[in-house]
Amino acid sequence: RGMWLGLGGLAKGMIGDEVIRLLKQRGIKSCRYRAGGDMVFGDAPPGQVGWRVTVPDLWIAAGEREAKPLTFTAANSAASVSGDVYRFVEIDGVRYAHVVDPRSGLGVTDRRVSCVRGERGIDTDPLATAGLILDETSWQAALARVPGCRGDVAPVRR
């Protein structure tokens, strides 16, 4: 009675993998799971090459002076987005993300959004979170250690 279960960390990505597996096992091949910033995709919708995904808060360079929201198509894969756009606390004018930097014990203050795409939600979920904490070189090295994963990170443009 009164129990609260938080699905932070890598739970949402891992659960997504299992949901899609179970749906496919029951004959539902074209499916998509989303919980927070975590998405896992089954087969593409009928007549489509994949599920169209736009990450409105992650703007990537599209030219020398232009930027546009990250958009991609996904099927039989996973994607996770992490950032402080919706979950944060402001204390004395400083915005702290819900993601805690283990080096300081405080919420991350560098306003970024990261998106990782890969084969499984259990991989993309924690790597997207790491994109908010690690410097670019360390994050790219972490991505390289997980086959099939790639990511984008950018400052929040709000």
Model feature map: region roles:
Residues 1-158:
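Mature catalytic core of soluble alpha/beta enzymes
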